[in-house]
Amino acid sequence: MARGSNNSRPGLSTLGYPGPSVLAREGALLTTHLWQKLTADTSAPRYSFGTLRAVTPTATLRRIRPLLRAAGITRLADVTGLDWIGLPVFQAIRPNSRVLTVSQGKGLTRAQGQVSALMEALEGFHTEEIPQRSVRETVGTMRRRLAYDPYALPLARPSFLSDTVPLDWVPATDLWSGAASWVPRQLCELNACVEDRLYVPLFRASSNGLASGNTVGEALIHGLCEVLERDCCGRYSEARFDPERCVVRDSALPRLAQRLLGLLSRAGMQTRIVDLSGPTGLPCFEVWLDHPDGPALTQGSGCHPNRLTALVRAVTEAVQSRLAYISGSRDDIPRHVYRDSMAPSVVGSLRRKSAEARRHFRDAPTVRATRFSPQLRDVVGRVRSFTGMSPVAVDLARPDFGIPVVFVLAPGLVLTDAQ
């Protein structure tokens, strides 16, 4: 369960933050440092092999390698050879992590896989101790200051959240207006260390929305797309095997996607691609891999404004999931997950219902943009139109590391396990 904090945190008035009347009068136009960095970000995708990044993976590796020791990352393991497929998958080991000691990464090249694993480990390091000073206020008090409903955040089941509950809140940024906002610290500080005190179930804390990037805009798009991905998977979890939503593997697929499916086929994989694009109109895909010799039925999903990037992410994540099972090194895969994923009823349902797939890749939406900031603006606007609330982000960047790391929350979107 997410950690709490002591009662010594100051309130808003103690720290000199404006009250509700001032915010209402000024239209909450207080912008944040994160927003200033975003508005100054003119970066554009310069690397586009299955992904869209501001610089090449090799350049990112040069930037982050000097930081690994300070973050406690002791090893980068290549686990690609444990499977038959051959797509690069790496694991970054951080023994003193307060949540997961093993972070995974995947890609179409070795450099992509290495960057993916190392950046995930660095993200975990950044979220264990949030640098911003928090304030302590009740939910009811904060509701009058916020442009979103705290009850629309991911809640525990059951949740004892009420207006009288005091919480620690950290500064955040409204991604539509740039206005200063607040989010519960419990949601974005991931620390599973056990303390000698009781924590009442309130929120469902997870790494969903935690993201990094070469630039602020790149990191924010990554985080928001991850939140949307989980929303799409949860929203259509009951209909994931609906043949009407399956993508036909035909000539309409881009060449890169055909090459990936050919690689999987040569490894003996049965592949099913499901179009889960949700009400925001962003492309989201779910990919299922099955092999007669196991180890299990595995799934991967991906969401991105560019539909090819979304599909590539789903495929590579499914491959990564297989290696998570095979390597057996993840702290978050208990024995029952292995058992359930190999249940004949699950595998049979997938094979039977996917046989009639008839949806085409070209039917999935796609969004084009030349720079990260306008692309983010478009995605934020779509979420805001659907939920009636703007996504918010916490700036987790540390001056001594210099890497853009953010935690994105989108009140009103669904957070449900895809399993």
Residue ranges of predicted features:
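Helix-biased "structured C-terminal domain" signature
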Residues: 2-419
